[in-house]
């Protein structure tokens, strides 16, 4: 069986890229009736020549009412005045149809009745000349727009879509720095802003000028604050490693570790290493190595912050950032966080509900220290008892036995 007897399904949809070299048939006589555009038969296919379906009309023998539609105007509603907001696309016939070829048609936007009102009958002058491609002359308030204007304006009035014409719109190249067209540019070159030194100020729009000057001033103040903070951080030396923090070899180490209750200078890596020491008690490792003031947490920062108000803002931003991360100890309700309500991380269940902060309980130990814990479990008590540090009296006993042995041997210890 030859493939030329099979209709190309890509050609039926209008997307065959093989063209005349296709191995399948490109004869529309073998195509199915479903490939005919039903919107074109109704007279208002918005795709026009770009439609993938066939813009052909059945003959009069195939259907009486449908066949006569090919010789009539697509829709009588196009000739009746309606509100300009109700707009659709209509196809104007430009040439006679040849079998096997797609007609070339021009897409024109017309007013269309969408309110369900009774439509006027077709004028006799239009029916008398079915092959004519002439259209009724639209009135000034029904001026047809192009398809591109309809896309830009959202099928609304073109003049209402933009507040300025091309001559009143600012040139984007001049606003970015330089326009190669110069004085020949069709767009408007704005005035130079005194802060950013760019041509971004519209000469005829005072509101745009005020808005840009406000944004530009806020940006300028923010950049100045960063410059002052960088200048104040250049000579800061870490009190542990005794190196200038911003002059370290690794870029990851050029960060400050700011203590919440202290103003001494440390780099982030050194103060974290200090607070991770295991040979000291918790109050010692949480205190400043110089002034011994206890700080609950360390805030990483690119710049050095010494002012208390700035530090409070930095602490709040740090807490908000930590509050967005899930706590690895809580594990969405499966685990227990040892920090309780003091934890800075997010305690949330799998459904997104936040866990209510649990009040820690106090316990007085035999050594006189107060311990805080959230829950009491038997295994925690046993594990704590097994790991409790007991003073080693073996050295004391051996010293006493040695002194007793020396006394019995008649050897007197020399006094200083």
Swiss-Prot record:
Region (Disordered): 113-142
GO cellular component: cytoplasm; nucleus
Pfam families: zf-CCCH (PF00642), zf-CCCH_2 (PF14608)
Regions of compositional bias (Polar residues) in chain numbering: 123-136
A single GO molecular function term of this UniProt record: ubiquitin protein ligase activity
Protein's pathway: Protein modification; protein ubiquitination
Annotated catalysed reactions: S-ubiquitinyl-[E2 ubiquitin-conjugating enzyme]-L-cysteine + [acceptor protein]-L-lysine = [E2 ubiquitin-conjugating enzyme]-L-cysteine + N(6)-ubiquitinyl-[acceptor protein]-L-lysine
Stretch list, region Makorin-type Cys-His: 193-222
InterPro entries listed in its UniProt record: MKRN-like, Znf_CCCH, Znf_CCCH_sf, Znf_RING, Znf_RING/FYVE/PHD, Znf_RING_CS
Entry keyword set: Cytoplasm, Differentiation, Metal-binding, Nucleus, Phosphoprotein, Repeat, Spermatogenesis, Transferase, Ubl conjugation pathway, Zinc, Zinc-finger
GO biological process assignments: cell differentiation; DNA-templated transcription; negative regulation of inflammatory response to antigenic stimulus; negative regulation of non-canonical NF-kappaB signal transduction; phosphatidylinositol 3-kinase/protein kinase B signal transduction; positive regulation of transcription by RNA polymerase II; protein polyubiquitination; protein ubiquitination
Subunit-structure text: Interacts with PDLIM2 (via LIM zinc-binding domain). Interacts with RELA.
Name the record gives this protein: E3 ubiquitin-protein ligase makorin-2
């Amino acid at each position: 069986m030859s493939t030329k007897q099979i209709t190309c399904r890509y050609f039926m949809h209008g997307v065959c890229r093989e063209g005349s070299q296709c191995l399948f048939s490109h004869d529309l006589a073998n195509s199915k009736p479903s490939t005919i555009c039903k919107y074109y038969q109704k007279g208002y296919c918005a795709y026009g020549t770009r439609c993938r379906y066939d813009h052909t009309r059945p003959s009069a023998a195939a259907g009486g009412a449908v066949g006569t539609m090919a010789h009539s105007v697509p829709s009588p509603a196009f000739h009746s005045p309606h509100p300009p907001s109700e707009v659709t696309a209509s196809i104007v016939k430009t040439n006679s149809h040849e079998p096997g070829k797609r007609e070339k048609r021009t897409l024109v936007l017309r007013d269309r009745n969408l309110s369900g009102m009774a439509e006027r009958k077709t004028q006799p002058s239009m029916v008398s000349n079915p092959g004519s491609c002439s259209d009724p002359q639209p009135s000034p308030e029904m001026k047809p727009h192009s398809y591109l204007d309809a896309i830009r304006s959202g099928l609304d009035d073109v003049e209402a879509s933009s507040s300025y014409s091309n001559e009143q719109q600012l040139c984007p190249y001049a606003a970015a720095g330089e326009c190669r067209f110069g004085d020949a540019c069709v767009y408007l070159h704005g005035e130079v802003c005194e802060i950013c030194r760019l041509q971004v100020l519209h000469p005829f729009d005072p509101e745009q000028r005020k808005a840009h000057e406000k944004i530009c001033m806020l940006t300028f103040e923010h950049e100045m604050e960063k410059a002052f903070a960088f200048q104040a951080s250049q000579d800061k030396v870490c009190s542990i490693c005794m190196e200038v923090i911003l002059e370290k070899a690794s870029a990851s180490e050029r960060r400050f570790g700011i203590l919440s209750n202290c103003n001494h200078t440390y780099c982030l890596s050194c103060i974290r290493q200090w607070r991770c020491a295991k040979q000291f008690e918790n109050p010692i490792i949480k205190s400043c190595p110089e002034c011994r003031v206890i700080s609950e947490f360390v805030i990483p920062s690119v710049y050095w912050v010494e002012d208390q108000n700035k530090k409070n803002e930095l602490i709040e931003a740090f807490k908000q950032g930590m509050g967005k991360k899930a706590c690895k100890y809580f594990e969405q309700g499966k685990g227990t966080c040892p920090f309780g309500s003091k934890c800075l991380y997010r305690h949330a269940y799998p459904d997104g509900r936040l866990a209510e902060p649990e009040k820690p309980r106090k316990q007085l130990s035999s050594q006189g220290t107060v311990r805080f814990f959230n829950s009491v479990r038997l295994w925690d008590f046993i594990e704590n008892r097994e790991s409790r540090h007991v003073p080693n009296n073996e050295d004391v006993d051996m010293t006493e036995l040695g002194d007793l042995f020396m006394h019995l041997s008649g050897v007197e210890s020399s006094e200083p």
